Amino acid sequence: MPIIYLSPSTQDWNMYVTGSGSEEYQMNLIADALEPYLLSNGIQYRRNRPEMTAGSSIREANSGYYDFYLALHSNAAPEGRYGEERGIIAFYYPGSVQGQRAAELFAEELREIYPLPNRVTTRPTTS
């Protein structure tokens, strides 16, 4: 049975310009919504905790045996462009064929529901 490490943002200080709460709040709502889908599809998961940081979440994931690491984060726009930047990037580890395939599958599904499908992309990264 596959097992993933689910890592929603822990950035409670990163408030959304729309007034809809923080990045931590919004990304945890997404993680909450994902959990029943994971379980109903036979996917086990471990989830980080709000008191953790990105670094401690990565360390915890690296100390375990997970098939996939799913980080849920959003990025802030530069000053003067608040509320103007939009899009989704599905990142994957460079050289990971399976990671790239997973990112492309996520992006494909997100294009179906995101209002700007041409702004849903994939990109390799190590940071």
Locate each region found by the language model.
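Active-site-proximal helix/loop segments of hydrolytic enzymes
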Residues: 2-4, 11-14, 21-127
